[in-house]
């Protein structure tokens, strides 16, 4: 477990020797607008590291790794992880390859889960029961740590097989383009004046009703960001309709 600035710096220096790493995060997002980082997992083929954000004050070594284009970063279904990295560090992993995207271009389901991927490639059935536990509580349990480590331990070896398979299929350039598009989309910030578009059936409203909803949705999103509170904890969607 990496719990100090010195330990993080030492880890990141060692990681620079490797061409690729697997990354994952554990976070909590129940009442907050922004995800609350609970743990970062990293595997470079030699070192499995669990990085405890509660003990780190200097993130510059990890930021340097995230932006180091000589090190490919692999994630699986990493859209939410990218949001965590962007909100916490102001950085996105570069370059990034998402194994769920690779798998989709090889004919797997679009939302192919990590456990299903691991079972197909290794025959191991992962226990995912820890996924919804409290990652902000300390100390983390042994089962939580084992669960978190497995997410990167299995990911990195599988990436090699998936890269070969995707290249053989002729879809690798398209898959890499899709990974870049995912990063671009994650950097797009929803403008408060467009928040009404995320409200179910808003298109059915009449002109004056829609104008009112647009103002309310704008205000709700601004308040949610200002107070770091999930939008439905500011005002529930059904209550917007009643107004």
For each predicted feature, which ranges?
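DEDD superfamily 3′-5′ metal-dependent exonuclease/proofreading module
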Residues: 1-243
